[in-house]
């Protein structure tokens, strides 16, 4: 699957196929979502887990990814690395797996964030995790030609997280006072996207014809961050088939 096919089409409809929410619901969830690292010692309810599994199954079908929910498995976050990352109580996580390709990281970011927002709507908390966890053999399935990119911790947070510092809209886009409202709203939502170490190394350029070019900067997980940013931008702007390359 090429980059244009992966992110450039109308994949915003995926999230509507999962649950009956409207754009305003998802904009609200974007504002409510904050990264959480400390979780209650409490299993996912069967009802919530079933809804999350259903969301993942639909997104896998749409995206061609092999994302998996891992439940009641605390060993991945019971390590020196996890403690260094200030994680505690994590026993459920989502493994983002897919076939190796140049755009795998971006697709995992884009579709993984859809799952994150759905989890938020189910009363769960999440945190993207790139390095500070341990791979436990046998708990997820990696097919031939596939790779694990990152995981997302998920569960009932001890807190709802907190607002982090953010760059300005002018630092991450070419917006001006005369930019269309949909572009400004998209940039606003993009600034709420979780990025590695809160680096926000992306740039959104409004081009001729109402198209948008999204560029990843240099840094850890920059391509994955770009996929997350695109997900947020589409929801905030209310537009989908807008990307140019």
Predicted regions located by residue number:
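Acidic, surface-exposed loops and disordered segments
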Residues: 4-245
């Amino acid at each position: 699957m090429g980059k244009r096919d992966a992110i450039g089409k109308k994949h915003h409809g995926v999230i509507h196929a999962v649950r009956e929410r409207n754009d305003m619901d998802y904009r609200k969830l974007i504002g409510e979502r904050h990264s959480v690292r400390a979780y209650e010692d409490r299993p996912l309810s069967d009802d919530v887990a079933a809804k999350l599994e259903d969301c993942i199954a639909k997104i896998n079908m749409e995206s061609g990814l092999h994302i998996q929910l891992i439940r009641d498995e605390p060993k991945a976050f019971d390590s020196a690395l996890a403690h260094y990352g200030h994680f505690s109580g994590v026993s459920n996580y989502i493994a983002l797996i897919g076939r190796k390709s140049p755009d795998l990281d971006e697709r995992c970011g884009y579709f993984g964030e859809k799952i994150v927002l759905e989890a938020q709507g189910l009363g769960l908390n999440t945190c993207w995790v790139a390095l500070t966890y341990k791979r436990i053999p046998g708990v997820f399935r990696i097919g031939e030609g596939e790779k694990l990119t990152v995981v997302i911790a998920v569960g009932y947070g001890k807190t709802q997280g907190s607002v982090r510092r953010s760059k300005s809209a002018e630092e991450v886009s070419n917006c001006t006072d005369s930019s269309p409202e949909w572009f400004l709203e998209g940039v606003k939502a993009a600034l709420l996207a979780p990025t590695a170490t809160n680096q926000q190394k992306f740039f959104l350029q409004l081009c001729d014809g109402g198209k948008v070019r999204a560029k990843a900067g240099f840094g850890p997980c920059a391509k994955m961050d770009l996929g997350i940013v695109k997900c947020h931008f589409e929801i905030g702007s209310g537009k989908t088939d807008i990307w140019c390359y």
